[in-house]
Amino acid sequence: MANVQVIFVAYIAVIAFSMVYGDDYKPFGEHNSYYGCKKQTDEFCNKICKLHLAKKGGFCHQPAPFVELCKCLDIDYDNTYFLKAMEKQCPKLKGNVN
């Protein structure tokens, strides 16, 4: 029984840690497609990731042959979506601000 409790506590700690510190994700553009960076520099991806509120910026990443996508470091999953990140930065986009 003690082993199950230890595993449960460790599991909760991992979830809490990832919620607080974010994770590494590929962000989605305005049309829910990934940002390609085949002809771009890491600076392009870094700017995109900062736009998506990534705390540590980003870089051009090659997850598969012939595919190069921006990858953001330390970003909340919700912020990987363009409009959600914009709503956090500009609350008036939600339409419920007086």
Swiss-Prot record:
Q: What is its main location?
A: secreted
Q: Name one GO molecular function term.
A: sodium channel regulator activity
Do you know which SUPFAM superfamilies this protein is assigned to?
Scorpion toxin-like
User: What are the UniProt keywords, alphabetically?
Assistant: Disulfide bond, G-protein coupled receptor impairing toxin, Ion channel impairing toxin, Neurotoxin, Potassium channel impairing toxin, Secreted, Signal, Toxin, Voltage-gated potassium channel impairing toxin, Voltage-gated sodium channel impairing toxin
| Disulphide bridges | 37-60, 45-70, 49-72
Is Cell membrane included in the keywords of this UniProt record? no
Tell me the Gene3D superfamilies matching this sequence. Knottin, scorpion toxin-like
Q: What does this protein do?
A: The homodimer inhibits HMG-CoA reductase (HMGCR) (32% of inhibition produced by 0.6 uM), a glycoprotein involved in the control of cholesterol biosynthesis. The inhibitory effects of bumarsin are seen at much lower concentrations (0.6 uM) than that for statins such as atorvastatin (5 mM) and simvastatin (10 uM). In addition to inhibition of HMG-CoA reductase, this protein lowers cholesterol levels by inducing steroid hormone synthesis via StAR, and by increasing reverse cholesterol transport mediated by the induction of ABCA1 and APOA1. The heterodimer non-edited LVP1 induces lipolysis in rat adipocytes. Induction of lipolysis by LVP1 appears to be mediated through the beta-2 adrenergic receptor pathway (ADRB2).
Q: Give the family this protein belongs to, as stated in its UniProt record.
A: Belongs to the long (3 C-C) scorpion toxin superfamily.
Q: What is this protein called?
A: Lipolysis-activating peptide 1-beta chain
Say which species the protein is native to: Buthus israelis (Israeli scorpion)
List the top taxonomic levels of the source.
Answer: Eukaryota, Metazoa, Ecdysozoa, Arthropoda, Chelicerata
